[in-house]
Amino acid sequence: MMTTATVLVELLTEELPPKALPRLGETFAAKVFEGLKARDLVAEDRGFRCFAAPRRLAVTVPTVRAAAPSREVTEKIMPVQVALDAEGRPTPALLKKLQAKGIAPEAVASFERRVDGKAEALFYTHLEPGAALDDVLAAIVQEAVKALPIPKLMRWGAGDAQFVRPVHKLAMLHGARVVPGRVLDLDAGRVTMGHRFMSRGEIELATAEAYEPTLLAEGKVIPDFAERRSNIERQLVATAQEQGASLGEYADLLDEVAALVEHPTVYVGEFELEFLAVPQECLILTMRANQKYFPLFDAAGKLLNRFLIVSNMRLADPSNIVAGNQRVVRPRLSDARFFFEQDRKHTLDSRLPRLAPVVYHNKLGSQLERVERLERLAGRIADRLHGDVAAASRAARLAKADLVTDMVGEFPELQGIMGRYYALNDGEGEVVADAVQSHYQPRFAGDTLPAGNTACAVALADKLDTLVGFFGIGQLPTGDKDPFGLRRAALGVLRILIETPLPLDLAALVGDAAEGFAPGLLTAADFESQLLDFMFERLRNLLREAGHAVDVVDAVLALHPTRIDLVPAKLDAVRVFRGLPEAEALAAANKRIVNILKKAEDELPEPDVALLQEQAEKALFHAVVEVAPLVHSHVANEDYTDALCALAGLRAAVDTFFDDVMVMVEEPLTRRNRLALLRQLAGLMNQVADLSRLSA
């Protein structure tokens, strides 16, 4: 049995982009593994280890052969009538083909003859040597490098190599042996480097298996990203507990910091208490975004004047590190305090004229024009909700004013948040201030929704103005490109309508939003219908992701219910109906009715009882007349489950009708009357959902 060993590949680089590091590491490792496996060099699939640190990408793959085993290969040579003459001797065409493939003419005697398609052909079976690791590893690594998700490549030095950052060393080992090869203008070896400051000089790797322990012991580097992240998290949690504090939300920052340090150590820093007079969101953002610090909070979630530093150094006396970080953060906090103090000198109302030169979109006008649309639309929505029209209009008027404040200019992520602080500073009521802050919500999947009718009215106005505006000028999302966030806006509208819930008609809301634009501005043909179709497609995906059955969702949405808040109740009703013994037969009958009615005239009269001839059609007519008031009453009262359950009483009459009655008879009056009866039946059955969409 051929012996196997672990393969190591490491690219030693300059500092890699931190936010891209995990994906770079995972992709590089996976592609190297796939390349080895595709060439049958992996004897036993035990997966692989991925290593990604600020200055290295690496992978180890166990049980790799030095050479893949030979394999039996059968290839078609050519049709017999072309390959052999009448006496069975090789033709010149066959001899030429054999020479090109390096096959001796004597081998023809061993060729197999078999039918291939319509003609008989010659087939040659032979052993093909497997790939040698030494011959292919460099090519595999090069393929992995090319497959990395790198938007921009760079060159360095005098060579032609290109990568996301300069690469200085290449290690390729198979067990204890260096695998020869050249990648990115570098010859493979067994040398790597450790921590930039805590290790000295080059480190020689004895074996591929020794990669991680050698880097840990000699290089002072934790090369495994997940282990490094866990190490940092353990230190952060333990240190926060020692401080009697909590960390708040930290997952995204933890990922970024884990990509910035090789040997993490957590220290505690602090800043002056006076800075806590600044809104804590400002301080938190500047510490996290600019300094990569982890703010600390008390049990109530209030910011403390302490923070955690993840250093790339472990020192017996860290006082200089702590003092240096405290010194660096102070000007940042001072800037935030200055912005806050300056911004409060001017009311949000007084800032509105400064929105006039701020372009929202070159075809949709300025931010000030948009504010005027939002003010009108939010008031209209609040009126539909029988809410506080004045508060909604006022909040919408002020909603974008913080865009021209110093604080939001420095930290765009604080838009809305700072608007609330400044609105309260100006003497606005809590309801208006809260609506100013929350009108951007939900910003992402799972985000909280605005609370209260006023906040919902402003949030809906903001999103509907965006959707109607961009659909109205023909700027629709395409593929994975959505530069104006229209999918996010659509989901926000749907979530607010469903989860709050709000008794608003989506089509009416779209119409209200469209009326706010200047005449002739929205020129795209049929954009309102396009937008509603887009919204229903988003709703379809939203409901499926929530776990609703595909056919149930399709049945409800087939009727384009514009009262989105009622959709969950309709889904529940259809799900209950589907469990009834009569459901399958009624759904099948509904499908049959739909197909029959496709052949009918567009205009059909009400069914005429005098034209009913067969007992079965009379029975169906009377059953429909009897059930219809009950169904209509339940639908009017939004009791959709009872409405659908009432349909169960129609099953016997429907079954008998289709067994005994021919609909498409020659006599036109009878045919039209029976079609009219079926149309009436379909209208009754499909008030809540299109039951023909239900699967068996």
Swiss-Prot record:
GO cellular component, one term: cytosol
GO process annotations (BP): arginyl-tRNA aminoacylation; glycyl-tRNA aminoacylation
Family matches, as Gene3D superfamilies: Isoleucyl-tRNA Synthetase, Domain 1
EC number: 6.1.1.14
Pfam families: DALR_1, tRNA_synt_2f
Catalytic activity: tRNA(Gly) + glycine + ATP = glycyl-tRNA(Gly) + AMP + diphosphate
Keyword Ligase applies: yes
Keywords from the UniProt entry: Aminoacyl-tRNA synthetase, ATP-binding, Cytoplasm, Ligase, Nucleotide-binding, Protein biosynthesis
First-listed, main subcellular location of the protein, grouped into a coarse class: cytoplasm
GO MF term list: arginine-tRNA ligase activity; ATP binding; glycine-tRNA ligase activity
Superkingdom: Bacteria
Subcellular localization: Cytoplasm
Complex formation: Tetramer of two alpha and two beta subunits.
Family to which this protein belongs: Belongs to the class-II aminoacyl-tRNA synthetase family.
NCBIfam families the record matches: glyS
Protein name from the UniProt record: Glycine--tRNA ligase beta subunit
Source species: Aromatoleum aromaticum (strain DSM 19018 / LMG 30748 / EbN1)
